[in-house]
Amino acid sequence: MKIVVMSGGLSPERNVSLSSGSMICQALRERGHRVALVDLFFGMEGRGVSHPEELFDAPIPEQFKTVSPQAPDLAEVKRSRQDQSASQFGPGVLELCAMADCVFLAMHGTCGEDGRVQATFDMLGIPYTGAGYLSSALALDKDMTKQLVAGRPGVTTPRWETVDCAAEDLDAILTRTALPVVVKPLASGSSIGVYIANTQEELRSALEHSRAIGGRTVLEQFVKGREFSIAVLEGEALPSIEIIPKAGFYDYANKYQAGATEEVCPADIPAQWEQRMATSAKEVFRTLGLSVYSRADYIITPDGTPYFLEINTLPGMTPTSLVPQEAAAVGIGYGELCERIIHASLEARKKGE
C-alpha cells in the first residue's frame, strides 16, 4: 500500500507525535509498504525534495526520532515556518495525502484529535486512520465526554466542574472548590497543563496558568488509587497496563523521560477489576461513537471501582507506548498493530464511520 504517516502539527504534543510518526513509518516500510512521513505544519519545507511524491522514498529526518522531555515552544515553531502561512497544513501536505491509499494519523492533542483534520479529509475523500471527525471532537473535549458517559452502564466518573478561568472570578472558584482537586485544560493530552492542587495557593497558581493558556478548565475530584490505561482495538479491550510513576504523577515529563515511570502489562490486578475496567472502556468507546482504536485512562480505588478519567482517540504509537505494549501482551507485534489499524480504518471509512 501507499501510505502517508502524518505527524507533528501545531500542537503542544508535536514532539511526541513526530516520534510516533517516525516509528510507524519505519515499521510499515519494513512490512513492504511505500510510506511517506510528513509534518502536518511544515509539509515539504526543509525535506530536500521538489515534489511530494519523492517523500515516499525519503529518509526519516533525525528531528522526528526523539521526544524532548519539554513541551515545544509553539510560538517559535510558528515563526520558523518559511511561508508564514496561517494554514495548519504545510506546503504540499494535501497533495501528498491525495496520493495515498490511507493517511495514518500519528497526531496528538488539539491539532489532529479535535476532528478538524478528519473533517477536511472526509470532504476531500482521503481515507485516514482512527475515529471520525465528530467522535474525535467529542472525545477531546473532557467536559463533553464526561457529560455523555457519566451514568452509562459500568461507567463511574469523578465529580467535576468546568470553569472559564478567563471570564470567572478566581476567588469565587477557590471558595467553592473542594481540595485536593485535579486541574486540567479542557482539550489537551500528554498531561500537559495538568496539576494536582492540595492547597488554595496551588489551586490559584494552576488556575492562573489555565487562564494564561486559554481559560476553559476542568476541575476534577481527586481520586486516590492506582493508575491504569486500557486500549480498545476494533471494539474489544486489550489487557490493561498499570502506570507507576517513580515521583509525582504521570505528567508530561514522567511520560517521556526514560526510566521515570514503571509500566506493568498485563496489570497485576484481580480478574474482576480487569473486567470492570474493560466493560467501562468499551461502553465509553461505544457511547462516543469511536471506531478502530482508543486508549482510556482510569484510577482504580482500593475497593476495585474503576474511575474513568479520559479517552484518547489517537494515542501514542511508539513501540514502547502504552497501546503497543498492551497489544504485544496478546501477541500482536508493532508492525502488525499498525497494519490492523489501517485495515480497520479503511473498513470504517467505507461504512461512513
Label every PLM stretch briefly.
Residues 109, 191, 246, 312-326:
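Glycine-rich phosphate/pyrophosphate-binding beta-alpha loops
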Residues 3-7, 19, 90-97, 122, ...:
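Active-site nucleotide/adenylate-binding loops and adjacent lid/helix of ATP-dependent enzymes
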Residues 221, 230-232, 285-317, 327:
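Conserved metal-phosphate-binding beta-hairpin within the catalytic cores
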Residues 1-134, 138-140, 144, 148, ...:
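ATP-binding N-terminal substructure of ATP-dependent carboxylate-amine bond-forming enzymes
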Residues 195-279, 300-307:
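Phosphate-binding site of ATP-dependent enzymes
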Residues 242-294, 325-353:
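Active-site "cap" helix and flanking loop/linker of ATP-utilizing ligase/carboxylase catalytic domains
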